[in-house]
Amino acid sequence: MGLAIKIALDLKIKSTIIEKTIPKIFFEGRLQYIKKGKLRRFVLKNEKIILDGAHSNTSGKNLYNYLKTIKLPIYCIWGMQKNKFPSEFLKNFKGIFKKIVTVKIPNEKNSCTTAELKKIASHQNYRTETAKDFKQAIKKITSKEPKVICFMGSLYFIGSVLKEN
């Protein structure tokens, strides 16, 4: 997907066309727009939810390349495994997120704590706070402002979110 976006951008395809086309392509847990289900109950109609299991530098760069085509403010809910180099991973998103809310991946021993992720995000000058779970994280972000809420950092994390949805 990321390579396809890169090629489209290199071919000077308008970002508006890319933005309209990508939601029609489906890879579970990869740039997955949530249009129905329990998650939608937590947000307003003018808020979009994207799930992406990006957890490596390469997948982070690919996600960044897509997110930078979005014109709305983007907020992040971030859960990640300790062995995936979270500090390096987050560097891929400079200037993208208006705010990051960190969460621990449920039932994962190797998950970073909310405090560990908050410290990483704060050191990279992000507005950040913690939440006990992704539902509380959504509550800390949702408002009347149109926006995109991007869940990212781990396929385990995205899987747990999808299970709840």
What are the roles of these predicted feature ranges?
Residues 1-99:
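Nucleotide phosphate-binding/pyrophosphate-handling subdomain across enzymes
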Residues 9, 44-51, 90-148:
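C-terminal helical cap/extension that packs against the catalytic core
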Residues 62-64, 89-91, 113-115, 162-165:
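Short amphipathic alpha-helical segments
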Residues 82-84, 106-109, 157:
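Short Gly/Pro-enriched loop/turn and capping motifs at secondary-structure junctions
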Residues 122, 158, 164:
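H/E-rich (His + Asp/Glu) clusters that bind or coordinate divalent metals
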Residues 137, 157-159:
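Short, active-site-adjacent cap segments at secondary-structure transitions
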Residues 154:
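Active-site-proximal loop/hinge segments that shape catalytic or ion-binding/gating pockets
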